[in-house]
Swiss-Prot record:
It comes from Measles virus (strain Edmonston) (MeV). Ribonucleocapsid-associated protein that interacts with the phosphoprotein (P), thereby increasing replication accuracy and processivity of the polymerase complex. This is Protein C. It comes from the Viruses. Keywords: Host cytoplasmic vesicle, Host nucleus. Interacts with the phosphoprotein (via C-terminus); this interaction allows C to associate with the ribonucleocapsid. Residues 1-44 are annotated as: Disordered. Belongs to the morbillivirus protein C family. It is found in: Host nucleus; Host cytoplasmic vesicle. One of its GO terms (cellular component) is host cell cytoplasmic vesicle.
Length: 186
């Protein structure tokens, strides 16, 4: 069908149903603009699209990290349950007299991570205030949190709150705290 169709209003005018590729008239030697050329955004908008896709990629990476963290927490929970079962009866009776052991603190922290996905410094300070009279329990809590900080992969620590990232890699600090704990309990 040609562009100059028969029309009721006039013979020489083009039909309104005929769609032209662009508002400019085509001239001899000039190539038509393709739909791909027309749909390409200007340079300024192209940068915006990259920012949006980078943000989307970042969100996907965070979601992937959250899934891996949930898997790591489940694995830790299974490991803590196994450790609890392996404790000897002598250690269990000693822990009952003492209160909380390192394993018990780790179990508590892993449960908190599973439920709220956060271990914060304020939670840690509250736990320290509750067990303040017992130097050994305080040392057990610090040791448990340090072990957790080193068991969870480093790239996922930022998703767990502010406690574990601050404890990660502070091995020298833990050795110093353990020496202080031994010297005060002797």
């Amino acid at each position: 069908m040609s562009k100059t169709d028969w029309n009721a209003s006039g013979l020489s005018r083009p039909s309104p149903s005929a769609h032209w590729p662009s508002r400019k008239l085509w001239q001899h030697g000039q190539k038509y603009q393709t739909t791909q050329d027309r749909s390409e955004p200007p340079a300024g908008k192209r940068r915006q699209a990259v920012r949006v896709s980078a943000n989307h990629a970042s969100q996907q990476l965070d979601q992937l990290k959250a899934v891996h963290l949930a898997s790591a927490v489940r694995d830790l929970e299974r490991a803590m349950t196994t450790l609890k079962l392996w404790e000897s009866p002598q250690e269990i009776s000693r822990h009952q007299a003492l209160g909380y052991s390192v394993i018990m603190f780790m179990i508590t922290a892993v449960k908190r991570l599973r439920e709220s996905k956060m271990l914060t410094l304020s939670w840690f300070n509250q736990a320290l205030m509750v067990i303040a009279p017992s130097q050994e329990e305080t040392m057990n809590l610090k040791t448990a949190m340090w072990i957790l900080a080193n068991l969870i992969p480093r790239d996922m620590l930022s998703l767990t709150g502010d406690l574990l990232p601050s404890l990660w890699g502070s091995g020298l600090l833990m050795l110093k705290l353990q020496k202080e704990g031994r010297s005060t309990s002797s």
